[in-house]
């Protein structure tokens, strides 16, 4: 039993139910479809595209949701922006052309982080 439940019983308060996070459908997404998962609709999951894959970052809503430090990445292919460690919206693309070895290494570090933290739920169709 969680500490919250114990305290709720002892203090005679009802637990406040926690709303479940919206679940993302496991499938392939077009860039246009991905844009609908940017956090503007709280009933929908938050999705991010990176190097041809789509990740469900809903559990990181504080980071990837509206107003979060990485909120601008939600609903977009942020491959190039992550490689360049940039928030420049002009870099929200899957284009790897011209990236140097350091940028490609940085991108791999980001991908490793996403793979370890968020479920990969599909592919980004424009990158196939």
Place the predicted regions along the sequence by residue.
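Histidine-anchored, small-residue-rich loop motif
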Residues: 2-128
